[in-house]
């Protein structure tokens, strides 16, 4: 009897593995994704193909990295998701002549009506938060230079001027797309009239992360975010950046690689679950690469896999709870928690219980395998993109072996128990001629924006502006 049951459990697990095998990517698959990513990057950089390229390769006008001589107080704003952060950054000489960066910050959550109302409502709310922060720190009387981390696709015309191309991540505030974001912020500050600010720089969160990590390690020339969304930036040779005049030196390019796949480059790798996630998203047909990796989508992918296993009578005796059938019910943090389970399955059992399920031991094991399959594919897909960037940098610099540091931020990278190990191992397999160091950014977005502002202020002083 026991043997029969054991055989049935083994057969069930084997069927589960057959279904989950769809998520496995072979090294040849990853090399294919990497080569296609490089081709799209090239198209994004070139003037004649930029418009139709899915990977936009947006110039950021960040050319210099901090040298350690900029000092002063800077205000930093960070808008990239449902939370908005205001930070005071003091850049100065530390002990023994070292450079020191001290920060104080406060988080504000953005109400739904500000995210989806008008641009005026959104930026009025942001300036209200700045006003509140300055009151708390008794700094209303000071006109501070301000660095703005704005983590949406922007076409820069200068370091302090950028046109919002399109909202992502659930934002829909009308009247912002096609307009200068810094102008919208300046107008809102003017409307309030109770404080003055000098907006000197606007950067993407990947750029802010790279600059913040450069402060720790001067070989950091790539910034990457794996959180709600997924994106990367890197220092490109100016001669390859056709959208900006000049051939000397390097400029940081914001790849906006989340949109890779929007022209069909990933079609052969998309599964039924991916198509369902895409169809029910706020932007169907867009940001397809990001939807395979980002935390906004990972939990939902797992939920759809679990429903398939229920329908195949391989999980929960073929019956799903009402909660499990509800879109968004299986949160991405559950994926991390399930994979963090120590082996007694308590954590998995508790999560499934909150979803109205009474799982068996085998159910718990199957749910864990589903989570591992989805998150491992995410790590491997992400590795193909980064390997594409790094191999490109090595080739354009004609280096036999390139040493490089990548600064990384984002909740999936930082909080998932195995993502970074799987990701690092896969990147290294795909970049055999590179020695890569990964560092995690601390308060990256805010500190990085302030350091970019410090560079901009120093330049302005040198130019006598």
Curated annotation (Swiss-Prot):
Reported effect, residue 228 to M: In MODY2 and PNDM1
Any one GO molecular-function label of the UniProt entry: fructokinase activity
EC number, as in UniProt: 2.7.1.1
Binding site for ATP: 78-83, 228, 295-296, 332-336, 411-415
Alphabetical list of CDD domains matching this protein: ASKHA_NBD_HK4_meta
Effect of residue 414 to E: In MODY2; decreased affinity for glucose
Annotated catalysed reactions: a D-hexose + ATP = a D-hexose 6-phosphate + ADP + H(+); D-fructose + ATP = D-fructose 6-phosphate + ADP + H(+); D-glucose + ATP = D-glucose 6-phosphate + ADP + H(+); D-mannose + ATP = D-mannose 6-phosphate + ADP + H(+)
Location(s) in or outside the cell: Cytoplasm; Nucleus; Mitochondrion
Outcome (variant: residue 449 to T): In PNDM1; decreased stability; increased glucokinase activity; increased affinity for glucose
Subunit structure comment from the entry: Monomer. Interacts with MIDN; the interaction occurs preferentially at low glucose levels and results in inhibition of hexokinase activity. Interacts with GCKR; leading to sequestration in the nucleus.
Protein name: Hexokinase-4
Organism of origin: Homo sapiens
């Amino acid at each position: 009897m026991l043997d029969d049951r054991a055989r049935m459990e083994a057969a069930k697990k084997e069927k589960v593995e057959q279904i989950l095998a769809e998520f496995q990517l072979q090294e040849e698959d990853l090399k294919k994704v990497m080569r296609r990513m490089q081709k799209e990057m090239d198209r994004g950089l070139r003037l004649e193909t930029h418009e139709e390229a899915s990977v936009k390769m947006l110039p950021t006008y960040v050319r210099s990295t901090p040298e350690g001589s900029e000092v002063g107080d800077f205000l930093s704003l960070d808008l990239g998701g449902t939370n908005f952060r205001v930070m005071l950054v003091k850049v100065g000489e530390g002990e023994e002549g070292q450079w020191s960066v001290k920060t104080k910050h406060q988080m504000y959550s953005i109400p739904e009506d500000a995210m989806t109302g008008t641009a005026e409502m959104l930026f009025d709310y942001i300036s209200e938060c700045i006003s509140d922060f300055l009151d708390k720190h008794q700094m209303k009387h000071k006109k501070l230079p301000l660095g703005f981390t704005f983590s949406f696709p922007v076409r820069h015309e200068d370091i302090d001027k950028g046109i919002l191309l399109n909202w992502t991540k659930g934002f829909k505030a009308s009247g912002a797309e096609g307009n200068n974001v810094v102008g919208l912020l300046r107008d809102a500050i003017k409307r309030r009239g109770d404080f003055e600010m000098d907006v000197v720089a606007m950067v993407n969160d990947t750029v802010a992360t790279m600059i913040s990590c450069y402060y720790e390690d001067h070989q950091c020339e790539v910034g990457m975010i794996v959180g709600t969304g997924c994106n990367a930036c890197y220092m490109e040779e100016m001669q390859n950046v056709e959208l900006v005049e000049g051939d000397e030196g390097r400029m940081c390019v914001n790849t906006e690689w989340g949109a890779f796949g929007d022209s069909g480059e990933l079609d052969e790798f998309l599964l039924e679950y991916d198509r369902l996630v895409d169809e029910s998203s706020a932007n169907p047909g867009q940001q397809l690469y990001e939807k395979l990796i980002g935390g906004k989508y990972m939990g939902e992918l797992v939920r759809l896999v679990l429903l398939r296993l229920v329908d195949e009578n391989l999980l929960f005796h073929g019956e799903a709870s009402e909660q499990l059938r509800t879109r968004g019910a299986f949160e991405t943090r559950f994926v991390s928690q399930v994979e963090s389970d120590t082996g007694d399955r308590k954590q998995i059992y508790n999560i499934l219980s909150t979803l109205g399920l009474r799982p068996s031991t085998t159910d718990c094991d199957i749910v864990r395998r589903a989570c591992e399959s989805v998150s491992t594919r995410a790590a491997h897909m992400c590795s193909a993109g980064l390997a594409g960037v790094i191999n490109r940098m090595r080739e354009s610099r004609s280096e036999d072996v390139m040493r490089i540091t990548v600064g990384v931020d984002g909740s999936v990278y930082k909080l998932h128990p195995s993502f970074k190990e799987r990701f690092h191992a896969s990147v290294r397999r795909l970049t055999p001629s590179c020695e890569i160091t990964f560092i995690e950014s601390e308060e990256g977005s805010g500190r990085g924006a302030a350091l970019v502002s410090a560079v901009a202020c120093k330049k302005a002083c040198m130019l006598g502006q």
